[in-house]
A protein has these predicted regions:
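Terminal, regulation- and interaction-focused segments at domain boundaries
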Residues: 2-36
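Sequence-level motif detector for i,i+2 pairs with an aromatic at +2
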Residues: 9, 57-59, 94
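Preference for bulky hydrophobic residues occupying beta-strand positions
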Residues: 14-15, 62, 88, 99
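A generic alpha-helix structural signal
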Residues: 25-29, 74, 125-128
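Compact, glycine-rich, soluble single-domain proteins
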Residues: 29-33, 37-89
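Short leucine-rich amphipathic alpha-helices used at interfaces
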Residues: 59-60, 66, 109-110, 116-117
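Beta-strand/loop substructures that line and gate deep hydrophobic ligand-binding cavities in soluble
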Residues: 87-111
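Well-ordered alpha/beta subsegment
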Residues: 110-134
Length: 134
């Protein structure tokens, strides 16, 4: 899927960050820690591509969440483990840093989550709003 096609997917949210990719990733990981969530992994996909002799724009995937919030979701909908822990992609799009993720309401719809369980994912929007705020 080309990046322009991804921008048309209503289930994917993309926001513009005023910081460079590395700065956005650093701010995100700091925010995750400050909120008491668990940082599971940070994958610098560009660095991995370079190790394979390939070129890729700056592309970093951050995996994080709260087992207290995610476990009930996975217990109710086991296939939701395909999308959990939560992931945020921080990437360079022709000199602009973008932050993309699967919308919490799209995840809730995909796995037919109750309103209570959907609420366990909803904080992602506020987190990314704060991330991209100047």
């Amino acid at each position: 899927m080309a990046e322009d096609e991804a921008g048309n997917d209503p289930g994917i949210v993309t926001k513009l960050s005023h910081l460079p990719v590395a700065g956005t990733v650093a701010k995100l990981t700091d925010m995750i820690s400050a909120k008491g969530m668990r940082l599971f992994a940070v994958i610098d996909q560009r660095a991995e591509a370079q190790q394979a002799g390939l070129d890729l724009r700056e592309t970093t995937l951050v995996f994080f969440g709260s087992p207290a919030a995610g476990t009930p979701v996975m217990a109710a909908a086991p296939l939701s483990a395909l999308d959990l822990p939560l992931k945020v992609l921080v990437w360079d799009d022709r000199g602009q840093t973008k932050v993309s993720y699967v919308a919490p309401d799209a995840l809730a719809a995909r796995y037919h989550l109750s309103a209570d369980l959907a609420g366990n994912l909803a904080g992602l929007n506020a987190l990314t709003d704060a991330l991209v705020a100047p």
